[in-house]
Amino acid sequence: MSFRDVLERGDEFLEAYPRRSPLWRFLSYSTSLLTFGVSKLLLFTCYNVKLNGFEKLETALERSKRENRGLMTVMNHMSMVDDPLVWATLPYKLFTSLDNIRWSLGAHNICFQNKFLANFFSLGQVLSTERFGVGPFQGSIDASIRLLSPDDTLDLEWTPHSEVSSSLKKAYSPPIIRSKPSWVHVYPEGFVLQLYPPFENSMRYFKWGITRMILEATKPPIVVPIFATGFEKIASEAVTDSMFRQILPRNFGSEINVTIGDPLNDDLIDRYRKEWTHLVEKYYDPKNPNDLSDELKYGKEAQDLRSRLAAELRAHVAEIRNEVRKLPREDPRFKSPSWWKRFNTTEGKSDPDVKVIGENWAIRRMQKFLPPEGKPKGKDD
């Protein structure tokens, strides 16, 4: 359930590059396959790769096409090389067309800092995402909602009194050419996290901005959790003097373990989406019914709904960590957004027993590209 203006902004964001062009599509698929091939060569030559539950992802992709629904995968964020290396653990047969290449979100200040990188990552189907104060109501999130919305369901956008609108379908060409709904992969923590023992392989809280993709897509996406370990051994955050040195492979022979979990129950997703629909009916702006009202963006009920759904997603990823991988239980503090905000604000002094390897990039002071002034009020998630 989405708003017309959200879908249109998603289209506009995707149209920043000529994604319908045959040349772009060829270069995009070639870039993705080349990156996949080089990553696969590195992993299977230098490391001990273990992939568990691949059949669950394969089945989810088949369901996505059969049921005309987007696919969303959700994973913990251990290192700067999680993407693309995680996809190199998968078999070649999965990537038989550009439609099977995942879309992902990448930090604007890292992946899009110059024209060459911007084109490279855009060809690799990465969406530029800004952090620190921009918040979840930005182009990459709108674009992800659009990608998860099948092209033939755009008339399912919300309008007052359940009226059906087909404005987007008139003389309309989608910003991308595809034969089925897209696959969007997210790292809901927003930042890499590597902690010293006994807290290794733990997660931050999940930012609620990514829940917009589930709540606002025209049809409920299939949501698959993934938990991975080992990539932090390839790219350790302990190397802080150079980003290039940080991503240079090390610890050859280490185990890389990627475990794919069961999709979230459709009834669970539907329950959250029904709550969202209720809030939309209650708080839409009669003067601008085609877009999110301030209450739907920043209101207490809307934020609570997104926060609960984000916690639900985290719990499903943590379940793989705890019940399938049998790793030591996470410290219960780590699932609390308020704990992390206090920990980041005090730069770790609030809980000195928790030590971050390298820099804690969630601390605003560490982001040199930012101006010194504080974040705009009401946009923090």
Swiss-Prot record:
Residue spans that sit within the membrane without traversing it, per the record: 26-47
Localization: Mitochondrion outer membrane; Mitochondrion inner membrane
UniProt GO BP: cardiolipin acyl-chain remodeling; cardiolipin metabolic process; inner mitochondrial membrane organization; mitochondrial ATP synthesis coupled electron transport; mitochondrial respirasome assembly; phospholipid biosynthetic process
Coiled coil: none
Pathway(s): Phospholipid metabolism
Keywords: Acyltransferase, Lipid metabolism, Membrane, Mitochondrion, Mitochondrion inner membrane, Mitochondrion outer membrane, Transferase
Region of interest (Required for membrane insertion), ranges: 215-232
InterPro entries: Plipid/glycerol_acylTrfase, Tafazzin
Gene Ontology molecular-function annotations: 1-acylglycerophosphocholine O-acyltransferase activity
Stretches in topological domain Mitochondrial intermembrane: 1-25, 48-381
Pfam family, one: Acyltransferase
Motif HXXXXD motif mapped to chain: 77-82
Variant or mutagenesis effect after changing residue 223 to D: Greatly reduced expression. Mislocalization to mitochondrial matrix
EC numbers: 2.3.1.-
This protein's domain notes: The HXXXXD motif is essential for acyltransferase activity.
Other notes: Present with 1340 molecules/cell in log phase SD medium. The enzyme was named after a masochistic character Tafazzi, once popular on Italian television, apparently due to the difficulty encountered for its identification and characterization.
Protein name: Tafazzin
Source organism of this protein record: Saccharomyces cerevisiae (strain ATCC 204508 / S288c) (Baker's yeast)
